[in-house]
Amino acid sequence: MSFDVGALVRARGREWVVLPESNDEPGLLLLRPLGGTEDEVTGIYLPLETVESANFHLPDPASDLGNHLSCGLLRDAVRLGFRSGAGPFRSLARVAVEPRPYQLVPLLMALKLDPIRMLIADDVGIGKTVEACLVARELIDRGEVRGLSVLCPPHLAEQWQKALAEQFHIHAELVLSATAARLERSCRQDESLFERYAFTVVSTDYIKSDKRRDEFLRTSPDLVIVDEAHTCAAAPGRSASQQRHELLRALVAPNTEDGASRHLILITATPHSGNEETFRSLLSLLDPRFASLPVDLSGEENRKHREGLARHFVQRRRADLEAYLDTVTPFPQREIAESHYTLTAEYRRYFDRVLAFCRESVLDDTLEKRRQRVRWWSALALLRALASSPAAAAATLRSRSATADGETVEQVDEEGRRAVLDLDEDNAEGIDVIPGTETGEEEAGERERLLRLAREADTLAGKGDAKLARAFELVEQFLGDGYAPILFCRFIPTVAYVATFLREKLERRGVVVEAVTGLLPPDERERRVEALGAHDKRVLVCTDCLSEGINLQQHFDAVLHYDLSWNPTRHEQREGRVDRYGQPQKKVRTLTYYGQDNPVDGIVLQVLLRKHKAIHKQLGIMVPLPSDSEVIEEAIQQGLFLRGESPVQQLSLFPELDKLWDAAVDREKRSRTLFAQNQLLAAVNTEVRAELDEVRRVIGAEADVRRFTRTALRTLGAVVSGDEPLQVDLRETPRALRDAVGHGERLSAVFSGQPRKGSLLLTRTHPVVEGLAAHVLETALDSALVGPARRCGVVRTSSVTLRTTLLLLRMRFHIVNQGRDGKERPLLAEDLVLAGFTGSPERAEWLPSDSLEALLDLGADSNIDAEQARTHLRRVIERFEDLLPRLDQIAEARGKALFDAHRRVRKATKSGVRALKVDAHKPADVLGVYIYLPAAMGELR
């Protein structure tokens, strides 16, 4: 005997719902208990066990009678328990996060494409990870994709794995250099690990080698998400970036069957590095035609180009999203300040000696070009290290230059720019190492001079370092004002130096100081950050290995730039670790820290950072550093080496660099205007509003979770107090409830944002809410159990003038999808519907659906005798046959609406993935029957 998906069956003494996966193996039924959770799914082998069709019985007035709260509690328990919701988005019933309305825009845009090729370039801290994962979860739940790979820098891999599992219930394997061999051991001889594991998070550095690249191209899944996508643009002279670009280009090659149909989602906050050709290479991954777009897309003649690109590209400022569709997103307010220090006399004299040495080294025109460039970069590296700390300066003076091995001028310059100028946008890995000064070509006297300078630097540590002393005062101010600060440093020795000093000063006061650098593997970095977050008073000292991708907002709310980055974008990335959605504090602080008489800081602050901040303040957007590094090098050389002893304060703005900044601003303004997607977004916004209302109706929203949790816990005997966080004492509740909730006798919870230490974030899929809903539903369906919700009730109220009957209906739908391979793929959808009428069942006057919600909030104005209430209920239940034709009509109408919604949001049909039909299981399950009597009605009518 076969059973349709969604059918109600009886086996092992209870009722079950047939799940879609039952079609995967002949003779095997996968069943979920009626009223149970996903954790209770069971397989039954038909040749060995008996399974029969079942019907859902009507409520029994003798044992199922409840009060006025019963219907609302039962309704909330059922819909919060749905994991196959019948709304337009199947994924939202499964995710452990309630997306902000603006985060649904990329999802709607993506579903209008086939294949999906999206570039999500929203500002830092808006939630691009959530936006991309929503698309992935939706495609999985629609049966359109069977696998997913996330390509990301290795230091972000564990964070991606955690987000996929905890927020989207996608359990992915990490494919890194350290894990690949273990994963491959579980594969068959002819099986790739990407065939073995449907969901993976893959290091872009691991996969780009030719051997691994070819294997990935052969077996990669049909959906790929690329984080930090700007590092995958084709960039002249950057072999790593070029390799990554070639991999992605091959993944979506239109001349291969898999490539032409593969979905690709690119994520980056900085899509445009300033190089138009590089930007076009990124766009070409969305559509090869975008590679040849005109440089200037303005004008009516380019409207089609703009509209075509706008369908694939979403880029929004945070300011535009703080209030979106009547929903306010609580982004923190950023307090920006500067602070400075003055070099001690001893440090100033030492700085002058080092600067003189560097000028002498750089301006030696007797050397051949390659040696000149090595010396230039070595001198610049030394000055950067000296501006950072005595420890960094000493280490640099004792280390070999990172550029010394370059065989050509071009190789020397490429390595120098990467190691010194912070212009490498690939990622923050490896940039915190000391670049070194020794070239290997020094005379003995020159080498001794370097070592003597290193020994002098050693003597300046501690008391001779005004920068460190002033920074300690600033950290004390942060802590005194209740902030948990992060100090970002440029070099590894500086982190160790600063962290050691702060520990000596602060640990006796109960402040815990932790140091994190690129020397630690990514998983150890996260462990240290999490461990530090458990302390009330904490300070994190780190390099830029934590400036990208890592979310630190849960434990930290202030940033001190101990060392100035020479790339303003890096400052924005640092501050974005704490200034982002989910920050529990209303305000965050950022402090730019510099030496007032430090010539290195002066140049960087004047020509790069302040200019960048002024542009950001004026436009509200982040403009990348001009990409012409030669002009930047010239500005630095003019300021540091060719202007003699001119005070930093007297340096004029450098005209060539100013021109570059102005050009970058014009380009960004023009780009934002051209790609503003005003017409497209206006249409999408209207659609988001309509679909969001339907989603909330079907599966509930944050407010429903909050209301249900409070009401259910109180009625079950828990002591509930407070607001945010909610404090719950479960000691006097039934043991079955404590077992279902699974968090001991006490818990603290919030329903939005980031929970503080010791609190839970309760979403509709959190085990606490899931367990509570399952307990309420189970005790309602089993009349032998005592619970807060019952399946029927009678309420006397002055809010109705005629006897009104409210029916709580659970509907199950069997959706048949057709995949790319032409095979039918069954899906299950569940919906909860209210139906109501006045009068008796045989002469029912059906009420409009939009008038029924108000009945759930009605309280009792007077009591009614229990036996009289049962008599009213029996009259309805005994004549229920008269209501079935109307209920079948409602089920058919809901099925049609579900079919239309399924097709409406997935308009693209090129792949052939489509809903063929939606069948409603009839009759609908009648979960509850509730009668509302006029207050003056004293007898049966």
Predicted regions and their residues:
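Conserved segment of the helicase C-terminal RecA-like domain
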Residues: 579-609
